UniProtKB/Swiss-Prot annotation:
The chain crosses the membrane at residues 108-127. One of its GO terms (cellular component) is mitochondrial inner membrane. Keywords: Chaperone, Coiled coil, Membrane, Mitochondrion, Mitochondrion inner membrane, Transit peptide, Transmembrane, Transmembrane helix. The lineage of its organism: Eukaryota, Fungi, Dikarya, Ascomycota, Saccharomycotina. It is found in: Mitochondrion inner membrane. This is Inner membrane assembly complex subunit 17. The gene is INA17.
Amino acid sequence: MLKRRSNALITLSRTKLFPITTVAYYHRRLLNQQRRAVSTSPKKEIKSLEDLANLDSLDGVDTELIRDLINEHTTKLNIKKELDMLKKFSQEEESGHEIPVKRFIRPLWMFILMGSSVYLLLHFSWWKLEHEERESQLKKEVEILEHQLNELIIQDKTHNTSRGKGSNESTHMKPWYRRWFW
């Protein structure tokens, strides 16, 4: 059995009868296959996976080279994904530090509406109390004025009755314009 590591061939034999002849046979056979594969394959240098994709077959290509190219490409992709993830985390962190205004618009409107409704309610109750107080003051003034008017009417009646007995009733019957001019 042959194993390939980097650029050296390591031979292992599991048969104990003819170990030397089997090793030599396998060694020569593999070397011949490699020479044919190298001579028939195009002499391009394979540097990337795209170069491998352009080949017709992978018969003469070293498996370690393919493995290294695949690992290199996966490493590049992993690094790219990690960078994208780090950018995403940094953007989330920056956006986490900034407090969005949208977060406060609804509570601000709620506060304004609640505050204005409380203000209107208190203003209405204050206006109602002032109105009732003013109404009670005006009622008292009306009562005082009615009382004064009643007193004056009573005084006038008593004054007219005492004066009315001695004066002419005919003068009261004349119209006012005749009393002035005749």
